[in-house]
């Protein structure tokens, strides 16, 4: 383990505290709710869902936060403006910690930022995300909102290298004429969470993992990713699981995906990650112990270099 020479930013936001030197603060964990084909969703366009089941999932993640000391985020996904607004209104009623405003639709993200501002809970919200594809209209909308935290994606489709990821943050790289950090600052973002943009295995997954070190070493900013997507996009694993099912080993086929899915978060944590978007919130009881264990090993090692873990660190809670 190691310490960065660069002073490391610590983000304190909506009750969560993360960032800093490896071993200082536990990794923050973000579980996604209302994702595509989530069984609790009854109408994905209108945002109709089983409220009792949704609250139970959010409460279970909060319980895991209390047990391990790892801060929890709720990543709220909605495919339409109506759905995302309905979802975040509900989440703000049952959860007072950080929540991500997430959608594949820019219009939906804009509507969510506006609603959070209007309803007075923008101080809980993390925009997902500021990236090279963001339109001027969306950035202007974000600027006019009260949202002050955002995922900032360091991905340049023209240059997926580690240098390319740093360049897109600093000067826009080969795709934009403005760096993503400057764009975030212009949009009123005070709390940038750098996402190293993990791509599939064989197409730059390793570059993204290495970029986590580079971002912290060069910029001192909190980093993380949705690295759990790597196993989902792994063709070999898909075929391997198919073979297991054909052999009648359905449970092993499920288990091997879970092992790789949760294990991916350990990779990000070990490579100086400050937060992970671990996937379905349903997996909180799997993700939190795995990442907490990793945090404990990192913190115990980092003590020899003078890094003192905070009181609520898993190393102080789970031994």
From Swiss-Prot:
Family: Belongs to the MtrH family.
Enzyme Commission number(s): 7.2.1.4
Recorded superkingdom: Archaea
The protein's enzyme class: translocase
GO biological process: methanogenesis, from carbon dioxide; methylation; one-carbon metabolic process
Encoding gene (name): mtrH
Catalytic activity: 5-methyl-5,6,7,8-tetrahydromethanopterin + coenzyme M + 2 Na(+)(in) = 5,6,7,8-tetrahydromethanopterin + methyl-coenzyme M + 2 Na(+)(out)
Keyword annotations: Methanogenesis, Methyltransferase, One-carbon metabolism, Transferase, Translocase
Gene Ontology MF: a single term: tetrahydromethanopterin S-methyltransferase activity
Gene3D superfamilies according to UniProt: Dihydropteroate synthase-like (3.20.20.20)
Protein name per UniProt: Tetrahydromethanopterin S-methyltransferase subunit H
Residues in the signal sequence: none
Source organism per UniProt: Methanococcus maripaludis (strain DSM 14266 / JCM 13030 / NBRC 101832 / S2 / LL)
């Amino acid at each position: 383990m190691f310490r960065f020479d660069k002073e490391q930013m610590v983000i304190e936001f909506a009750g969560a505290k993360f960032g800093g030197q490896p071993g200082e603060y536990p990794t923050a964990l973000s579980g996604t709710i209302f994702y595509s084909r989530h069984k609790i969703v009854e109408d994905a366009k209108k945002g109709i869902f089983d409220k009792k089941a949704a609250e139970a999932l959010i409460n279970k993640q909060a319980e895991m936060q209390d047990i391990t000391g790892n801060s929890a985020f709720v990543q709220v996904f909605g495919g339409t403006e109506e759905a995302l607004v309905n979802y975040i209104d509900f989440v703000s009623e049952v959860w007072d910690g950080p929540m991500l405003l997430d959608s594949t639709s820019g219009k939906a993200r804009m509507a969510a930022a506006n609603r959070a501002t209007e309803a007075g809970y923008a101080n809980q919200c993390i925009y997902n995300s500021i990236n090279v594809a963001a339109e001027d209209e969306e950035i202007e909308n974000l600027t006019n909102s009260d949202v002050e935290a955002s995922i900032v994606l360091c991905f340049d489709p023209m240059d997926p290298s580690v240098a390319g990821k740093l360049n897109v943050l600093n000067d826009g790289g080969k795709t934009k004429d403005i760096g993503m950090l400057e764009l975030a600052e212009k949009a009123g973002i005070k709390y940038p969470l750098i996402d190293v943009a993990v791509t599939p295995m064989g197409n730059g997954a390793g570059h993204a993992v290495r970029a986590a070190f580079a971002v912290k070493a060069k910029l001192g900013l909190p980093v993380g990713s949705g690295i759990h997507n790597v196993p989902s996009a792994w063709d070999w694993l898909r075929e391997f699981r198919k073979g297991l099912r054909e052999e009648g080993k359905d449970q092993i086929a499920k288990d091997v995906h879970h092992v790789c899915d949760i294990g991916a978060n350990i990779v990000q944590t070990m490579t100086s990650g400050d937060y992970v978007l671990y996937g379905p919130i349903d997996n909180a009881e799997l993700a939190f112990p795995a990442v907490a264990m990793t945090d404990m090993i990192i913190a115990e090692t980092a003590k020899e270099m003078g890094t003192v873990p905070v009181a609520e660190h898993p190393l102080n809670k789970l031994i």
